């Protein structure tokens, strides 16, 4: 499997996990993203690359934001996103798992 194919499959897997986590069908995501279901299926399966604008629309349909992070910053961003010992240790921008609003 080529590096490009591996990346497409990885992106598709992330999209699939996000979609299933929201209990959405491929049809629903495709409609919200403004593409056909067959096109969405190809992207989610990693069989086809997508334009950046299409990925942005899909991500937003799934409540995600596509971001480009400078490579030297990736370790720091990954560290921020790693779970810690308790909810008190979560960065301020991560939703608490208990659903309480302190504001």
Where are these regions (language model features)?
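Short, basic-rich loop-to-helix N-cap that marks the start of a DNA-contacting helix
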Residues: 46-60, 67
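Short basic helix-loop element that most often maps to the first helix and adjoining turn
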Residues: 13-28, 57
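Short alpha-helical DNA-recognition segment
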Residues: 24-41
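Residue-level detection of the helix-turn-helix DNA-binding "recognition helix"
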Residues: 20, 34, 45-47
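Short, charged recognition helix plus adjacent turn
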Residues: 69-103
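A detector for short, charged/polar N-terminal pre-domain segments
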Residues: 1-10
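Helix-turn-helix-like N-terminal two-helix hairpins of bacterial/phage DNA-binding regulators
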Residues: 13, 40-43, 50
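Short Asp/Glu-rich motifs
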Residues: 38, 49, 78-79
């Amino acid at each position: 499997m080529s590096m490009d194919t591996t990346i497409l499959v990885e992106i598709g897997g992330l999209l699939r996990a996000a979609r299933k986590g929201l209990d959405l069908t491929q049809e629903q995501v495709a409609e919200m993203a403004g593409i056909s279901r067959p096109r969405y299926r190809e992207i989610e399966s990693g069989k086809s690359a997508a334009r950046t604008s299409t990925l942005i629309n899909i991500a937003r349909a799934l409540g995600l934001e596509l971001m480009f992070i400078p490579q030297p910053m990736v370790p720091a961003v990954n560290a921020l996103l790693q779970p810690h010992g308790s909810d008190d240790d979560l960065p301020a921008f991560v939703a608490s798992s208990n659903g309480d609003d302190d504001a």
